[in-house]
From Swiss-Prot:
Its EC number is 2.5.1.78. One of its GO terms (molecular function) is 6,7-dimethyl-8-ribityllumazine synthase activity. It comes from the Bacteria. Catalyzes the formation of 6,7-dimethyl-8-ribityllumazine by condensation of 5-amino-6-(D-ribitylamino)uracil with 3,4-dihydroxy-2-butanone 4-phosphate. This is the penultimate step in the biosynthesis of riboflavin. It is an enzyme of class 2 (transferase). The lineage of its organism: Bacteria, Bacillati, Bacillota, Bacilli, Bacillales. Keywords: Riboflavin biosynthesis, Transferase. This is 6,7-dimethyl-8-ribityllumazine synthase.
Amino acid sequence: MNFEGKLVGKDLKIAIVVSRFNDFITTRLLEGAKDTLIRHEVEDTNIDVAYVPGAFEIPLVAKKLAQKGEYDAVITLGCVIRGATSHYDYVCNEVAKGVSKANDISDTPVIFGVLTTESIEQAVERAGTKAGNKGSEAAVSAIEMANLIKQIN
C-alpha cells in the first residue's frame, strides 16, 4: 500500500503561528501561506492565526494548538536574521527543536516555516521575491501532511 497526501485543502482546519518580530518579513510569509491555503480550497474561516512576540515563543503556542485536536495541521512562521552575536544560533536551534518536539506530542503535523537567514536580503528573497515564498511552501506541506495523516489513520 502507498500513502500520499493530496494537495486538496477542502474541509481542512489549519492553525498558523506567526512571529511579530521582523514583521516586515513575517507578514509576507503569512500572506503567502493564507493565499496558498485558500487556493487549495481551505475555507478562510478554517484558518486561525496566533501571533507571538518572537520566534522563540513559536514552539509553545504550536504545541498547545496541536494538542487541542481541533486542527489538521499547524504552520509555524517566523524570521531570525543573523546579527553580530551568538543569539541567532541559540534562537534558531531552540525554535527548530521546539517545533520538532511539538510534532512528537500529537498526531497533528506541525510545519516548520521559520526563516533562518544570514541577512535581511536573504529573508526578503524567501518572503516572496527571488526565492519564492516560504510561507506558501509551508502551507503546501501542511495540506499534504494533513491529508497523509488522515490516510494513515
